[in-house]
Swiss-Prot record:
A motif (DEAD box) lies at residues 264-267. Residues 331-491 form the Helicase C-terminal domain. It is found in: Cytoplasm; Nucleus. It is an enzyme of class 3 (hydrolase). This is ATP-dependent RNA helicase DBP2. InterPro entries: DEAD/DEAH_box_helicase_dom (IPR011545), Helicase_ATP-bd (IPR014001), Helicase_C-like (IPR001650), P-loop_NTPase (IPR027417), RNA-helicase_DEAD-box_CS (IPR000629), RNA_helicase_DEAD_Q_motif (IPR014014). Disulfide bonds: none annotated. Belongs to the DEAD box helicase family. DDX5/DBP2 subfamily. Associates with polysomes. It comes from Candida glabrata (strain ATCC 2001 / BCRC 20586 / JCM 3761 / NBRC 0622 / NRRL Y-65 / CBS 138) (Yeast). Residues 501-531 have a biased composition (Gly residues).
Length: 544
């Protein structure tokens, strides 16, 4: 029996887009009764109208048996998938660099039709013109649709948002409708406002046929509009941990209806110090929920969080757990002094600007450096804007939109401001200042070379960065990049006859950007100063 058959049997037709929603009227009455009787789940120590109160963890041992049941297993294996041999499955996983952990793991799918999504979901997917599922989606969809707790480990830009968004829509459509005062059914926690907004766009796009409402809750802006949307009711809430805690403590929403929980970029949330807030939030959610954790890395802190809050999880990992950079990215490292950086930067901008569609993301270590670089570039006629923590939310939104649309194709950012930013078509990443650790280096350069595209990462390495030398060499070596001779003095590995990989920057190999005859490649050259760079009066054309 497929999804639609199963949903037909649940008797409750919902006018929302003509889909069949699960649940009996008695289920809704149960929820209403719980609320009217002072149901303590997601409760506060004090009345909602008394102002902020401390959240208290419900006594789940006594409360859980009295909660209304819910459905979370909707997966019906497609006949083609069912007939796929173990050898074929193993070969597919090997080719996809896929590692799985756990028991009773469903076989991967290879097409959208094999996933078994209802027609209303498939229609939205195909309307977007997607060719085929990504590797994480091939295994993640059957896992999520099966109702299992799961961990997905994959690089940023691998399609993980749809891996949990589409099953979440199916999950919502099988639950009782929201009643006045109910909180969300699906809760997505994300580390930054920018990522939360990006997730909301995907949820809106694919949930519109079901008329599923969503809202995004994040800090840095007035709370009024967010409060109104929460009170009006939304099946999906995407939130940053801090602002959600504020809303819960103020009694503006509750988590008693949450049965599908997503922790997106769990590693980044922990890096940013959100672990106490995450634990406080998750403690408010019924423990028999379905929980999906997504992460680009698998450090011990994330593993501990999974052990504490996931029940018998299954895990899929794309690629190696060892820290590695995408092989779609050409890494160019220049060993320079501090005062050489600006001239080197302009040289690379001259080259990159030959492509009018180029977008360049420049990382600086401090807000002051960020502003100084931007001011210097703008005085020289370059269309650059800065984004960092001292900018108010409205200005950050404007800068990001200018960068995304290409009106200002150069953006200078700090790490904190850039976290969660998902902009398509970034061709170049420049580490004007190297980050403090190798994990941030990999995360930074991963803003280019996404979704099968190629990109270039340029890094200025100074003597102050010597502590990163060995790990940087290791990352470049794994990706078969050309390592400059000046950097090799930091190598901890014994020098063999071929310590550096051939090709690449300045050696007549792949060349700048990976193409034959590119910058520094055979037959290459910088060319003129046309492209996207602006004149000082703000127009397009050659710089003066």
């Amino acid at each position: 029996m497929g999804y639609r058959d199963a949903l037909y049997n649940k008797t409750n037709y919902n006018s929302r887009g003509g889909d069949f929603r699960g649940g009996r009227s008695s289920d809704r009455n149960d929820y209403n009764r719980d609320r009217n009787q002072g149901y303590s789940h997601g409760g506060l120590r004090g009345r909602h109208d008394d102002g902020p109160r401390e959240l208290i963890k419900p006594d789940w041992e006594s409360e859980l048996p009295n909660l209304p049941p819910f459905e979370k297993n909707f997966y019906v294996e497609h006949e083609v998938v069912r007939n796929r041999s173990d050898q074929e499955v193993a070969q597919f996983r090997k080719e996809s660099e896929m590692t799985i952990t756990g028991h009773d793991i469903p076989k991967p799918i290879t097409t959208f039709d094999e996933a078994g999504f209802p027609d209303y979901v498939l229609k939205e997917v195909k309307a977007e013109g997607f060719d085929k599922p990504t590797s994480i989606q091939c295994q993640g969809w059957p896992m999520a649709l099966s109702g299992r707790d799961m961990v997905g480990i994959a690089a940023t830009g691998s399609g993980k948002t749809l891996s949990y968004c589409l099953p979440g829509i199916v999950h919502i459509n099988a639950q009782p409708l929201l009643s006045p005062g109910d909180g969300p059914i699906v809760l997505v926690l994300a580390p930054t406002r920018e990522l939360a907004v990006q997730i909301q766009k995907e949820c809106s796009k694919f949930g519109k046929s079901s008329r599923i409402r969503n809202t995004c809750v994040y800090g840095g802006v007035p709370r009024g509009q967010q409060i109104r949307e929460l009170i009006r009711g939304a099946e999906i809430v995407i939130a940053t941990p801090g602002r959600l805690i504020d809303m819960l403590e103020a009694g503006k929403t509750n988590l008693k209806r949450v049965t599908y929980l997503v922790l997106d970029e769990a590693d980044r949330m922990l890096d940013m110090g959100f672990e106490p807030q995450i634990r406080k939030i998750v403690d408010q959610i019924r423990p028999d929920r379905q929980t999906l954790m997504w992460s680009a890395t698998w450090p011990k802190e994330v593993q501990q969080l999974a052990r504490d809050y996931l029940n018998d999880p299954i895990q899929v990992q794309i690629g190696s757990l060892e820290l590695a950079a995408s092989h779609n990215i050409t890494q160019l490292v220049e060993v320079v002094s501090e005062f050489e950086k600006r001239d080197r930067l302009v040289k690379h901008l001259d080259t990159a600007s030959q492509d009018k569609e180029s977008k360049i993301l420049i990382f600086a270590s401090t807000k002051r450096t960020c502003d100084e670089i931007t001011s210097y570039l703008r005085q020289d006629g370059w269309p650059a804007l800065a984004i960092h923590g001292d900018k108010d939310q409205r200005e950050r939104d404007w800068v990001l939109n200018e960068f995304r649309t290409g009106n200002s194709p150069i953006m200078v950012a700090t790490d904190v401001a850039a976290r969660g930013i998902d902009v398509k078509g970034i061709n170049f990443v420049v580490n004007y200042d190297m980050p403090g650790n190798i994990e941030d280096y990999v995360h930074r350069i991963g803003r280019t070379g996404r979704a099968g595209a190629t990109g270039t990462a340029i890094s200025f390495f100074t003597e102050d960065n010597k502590s990163l030398g060995a790990s940087l060499i290791s990352i470049m070596r794994e990706a078969k990049q050309n390592i400059p001779e000046e950097l090799m003095k930091y190598d901890r590995r014994p020098r063999g006859p071929h310590p550096r990989y051939g090709g690449g920057y300045g050696r007549g190999g792949r060349g700048y950007g990976g193409g034959r005859g590119g910058y520094g490649g055979r037959g290459g050259g910088r060319g003129g100063r046309g492209g996207f760079n602006r004149s000082r009066d703000g127009g397009w054309g050659n710089r003066r």
